[in-house]
Amino acid sequence: MSASEAKPKSMTRAKQWSDEIENLYRFQTAGYRDEVEYRHVKQVEMVDRWPETGFVKKLQRKDNTFYYYNKKRECEEKEVNKVKVYAY
């Protein structure tokens, strides 16, 4: 099984905000588990990111609608525990 076909072995909920949690939040609001699933579904090598922060800049949903994100944090504190962290 290649990395692009990997299925998660487990899932936990985020406890506190971090850069990783911010990016997971962005993927999940666009309808994907994480970057692994996004890259597999959309067949892309790179995800658009803000150079200053490294946060995801733009994602395309499965219905081809684009989501655009700001340079700054978008995952509010009350949303952190809704973010799912997958382990492969």
UniProtKB/Swiss-Prot annotation:
Essential for spermiogenesis. Keywords: Differentiation, Spermatogenesis. It comes from Xenopus laevis. GO terms for cellular component: nucleus. PANTHER family: MEIOSIS EXPRESSED GENE 1 PROTEIN HOMOLOG, MEIOSIS-EXPRESSED GENE 1 PROTEIN. This is Meiosis expressed gene 1 protein homolog. One of its GO terms (biological process) is spermatogenesis. Belongs to the MEIG1 family. It holds the Pfam family Meiosis_expr. The keyword Repressor does not apply. The keyword Cytoplasm does not apply.
